[in-house]
């Protein structure tokens, strides 16, 4: 308003504003009055914002980023990939659903429709065309049944059902 009295021009309609949207008219009026008082030159203190506030803190939106319910409880499942020599597809199984090796081997036999047989420490998987192996956390391939079940279920990364002719490299008894 004081600005209009000095110049006697109505420039308010065409005025370009560099402020953020939502600022009040009161701040504009105070700046206009201060320009008139200092011969249309603003002082350094007048150019600074009166309210030096910190930027608003970023709060995380609840539910973002989206997490699948299957990934929320990682302790309740332990999925590993299962491959079979000659099969064109992979499967995944949850090791926590099985309590011991016989249950796991039975599930693998049903899944791939093959006969694996039972494991014997001295003979390995004799009498079977396929041998179940697994990769542990260190990247070593071992026969399923070589270690106690708890150690196996915690260290297994992948399962592979190999042809019996490929397995002698893992176990010298075959």
From Swiss-Prot:
Its main location: nucleus. InterPro entries: AUX/IAA_dom, AUX_IAA, PB1-like. GO terms for biological process: auxin-activated signaling pathway; response to auxin. Residues 77-164 form the PB1 domain. Residues 44-67 are annotated as: Disordered. It is found in: Nucleus. It holds the Pfam family AUX_IAA. The keyword Transcription regulation applies. Preferentially expressed in vegetative organs. Aux/IAA proteins are short-lived transcriptional factors that function as repressors of early auxin response genes at low auxin concentrations. Repression is thought to result from the interaction with auxin response factors (ARFs), proteins that bind to the auxin-responsive promoter element (AuxRE). Formation of heterodimers with ARF proteins may alter their ability to modulate early auxin response genes expression. PANTHER family: AUXIN-RESPONSIVE PROTEIN IAA17 (PTHR31734), AUXIN-RESPONSIVE PROTEIN IAA2 (PTHR31734:SF222). Homodimers and heterodimers. Interacts with the auxin-responsive protein IAA1. Interacts with TPL. This is Auxin-responsive protein IAA2. It comes from Arabidopsis thaliana (Mouse-ear cress).
């Amino acid at each position: 308003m004081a600005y209009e009295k000095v110049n006697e021009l109505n420039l308010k309609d065409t005025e370009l504003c560099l402020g953020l949207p939502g600022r009040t008219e009161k701040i504009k009026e105070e700046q206009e009055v201060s320009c008139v008082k200092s011969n249309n030159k603003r002082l350094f203190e007048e150019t600074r914002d009166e309210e030096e506030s910190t930027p608003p803190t970023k709060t995380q939106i609840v539910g973002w980023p989206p997490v699948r319910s299957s990934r929320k409880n990682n302790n309740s499942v332990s999925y590993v990939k299962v491959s079979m020599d000659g099969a064109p597809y992979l499967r995944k199984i949850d090791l926590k659903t099985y309590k011991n090796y016989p249950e796991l081997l039975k599930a693998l036999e049903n899944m791939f429709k093959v006969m694996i047989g039972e494991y014997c420490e001295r003979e390995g998987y004799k009498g079977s065309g396929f041998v179940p192996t697994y990769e542990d956390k260190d990247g070593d391939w071992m026969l399923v049944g070589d270690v106690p079940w708890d150690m196996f279920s915690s260290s297994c990364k992948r399962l592979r059902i190999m042809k019996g002719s490929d397995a002698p490299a893992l176990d010298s008894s075959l």
